């Protein structure tokens, strides 16, 4: 079970809603992924009406909505976006995203920390998208974030776990949930990072752009569950030399 801000969720796979060909496919994929938490863009939240098929589909699924502040270029804009989402949905959940660079969409660490501190004081459950920086993640934890969401690779790139060495340090040091966000392109990568000990992953592009998004969502759900089971079971130690699994006895030597 995944616990965030005193709320418990059965799934450790969070999904996004962007890039799907239509709302029906998105709804089927989210259902197949068995996700309890789903992110959505502020433009969906701001509309907040029955005409928005994506928002309608998500409400029918009964998932927890996690509005993001994507598009915000600084802390002030992000705080404003979060307050708008609260007015529209009455929810204090927010995925904090501040990436002024539109080419690589890398998060601004300084503005993210500033916005996180402000939003926590305002009573929001803040889940910040951030670089895989162990020092920054501890600072975000210190200001009261409900979790940290370090990237595996740039958003939408499907490049996989480019930041794996730093993710390991973040997991080792964190006292709050670690959710790897961005860059995961294959179920095997989701499984690998879950084996590492992260608490959850967020996947959007890899599912939405697959030839069969629903089947891919199922694959990711299985991978996340398998990876978590492996972590909890306790992975065997690695060795630089061979270690025989059977006794090396002298039974082939001639007897006297």
Swiss-Prot record:
It is found in: Cytoplasm. One of its GO terms (molecular function) is thiazole synthase activity. GO terms for cellular component: cytoplasm. 1-deoxy-D-xylulose 5-phosphate binds at residues 156, 182-183, 204-205. Keywords: Cytoplasm, Schiff base, Thiamine biosynthesis, Transferase. Pfam families: ThiG (PF05690). It is an enzyme of class 2 (transferase). The active site is at 95 (schiff-base intermediate with dxp). It comes from the Bacteria. Its EC number is 2.8.1.10. InterPro entries: Aldolase_TIM (IPR013785), Thiazole_synthase_ThiG (IPR033983), ThiG (IPR008867). Signal peptide: none annotated. GO terms for biological process: thiamine diphosphate biosynthetic process. Pathway: Cofactor biosynthesis; thiamine diphosphate biosynthesis. It catalyses: [ThiS sulfur-carrier protein]-C-terminal-Gly-aminoethanethioate + 2-iminoacetate + 1-deoxy-D-xylulose 5-phosphate = [ThiS sulfur-carrier protein]-C-terminal Gly-Gly + 2-[(2R,5Z)-2-carboxy-4-methylthiazol-5(2H)-ylidene]ethyl phosphate + 2 H2O + H(+). Its main location: cytoplasm. Catalyzes the rearrangement of 1-deoxy-D-xylulose 5-phosphate (DXP) to produce the thiazole phosphate moiety of thiamine. Sulfur is provided by the thiocarboxylate moiety of the carrier protein ThiS. In vitro, sulfur can be provided by H(2)S. Homotetramer. Forms heterodimers with either ThiH or ThiS. Belongs to the ThiG family. This is Thiazole synthase. It comes from Alteromonas mediterranea (strain DSM 17117 / CIP 110805 / LMG 28347 / Deep ecotype). The lineage of its organism: Bacteria, Pseudomonadati, Pseudomonadota, Gammaproteobacteria, Alteromonadales.
């Amino acid at each position: 079970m995944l616990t965030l801000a005193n709320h418990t969720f059965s799934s450790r796979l969070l999904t996004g809603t962007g890039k799907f060909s239509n709302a029906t496919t998105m709804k089927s994929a989210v259902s197949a992924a068995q996700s309890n938490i789903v992110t959505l863009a502020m433009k969906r939240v701001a509309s907040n009406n029955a005409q928005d098929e994506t928002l309608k589909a998500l409400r029918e699924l009964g998932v927890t909505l996690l509005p993001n502040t994507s598009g915000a270029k600084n802390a002030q804009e992000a705080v404003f976006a979060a307050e708008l989402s609260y007015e529209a949905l009455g929810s204090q959940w927010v995925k904090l995203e501040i990436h002024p660079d539109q080419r690589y969409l890398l998060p601004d660490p300084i503005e993210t920390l500033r916005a996180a501190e402000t939003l926590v004081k305002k009573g929001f459950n803040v889940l910040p998208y951030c670089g895989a920086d162990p020092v920054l993640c501890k600072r975000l934890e210190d200001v009261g974030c409900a979790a940290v969401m370090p990237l595996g690779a740039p958003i939408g790139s499907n490049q996989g776990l480019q930041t794996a060495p730093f993710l390991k340090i973040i997991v080792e040091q964190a006292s709050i949930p670690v959710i790897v966000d961005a860059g995961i392109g294959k179920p095997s990568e989701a499984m690998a990072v879950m084996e590492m000990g992260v608490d959850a992953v967020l996947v959007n592009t890899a599912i939405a752009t697959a030839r069969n998004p629903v089947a891919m969502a199922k694959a990711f759900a299985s991978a996340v569950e398998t990876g978590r089971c492996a972590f909890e079971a306790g992975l065997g130690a690695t060795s630089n030399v061979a270690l025989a699994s059977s006794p090396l006895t002298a039974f082939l030597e001639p007897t006297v």
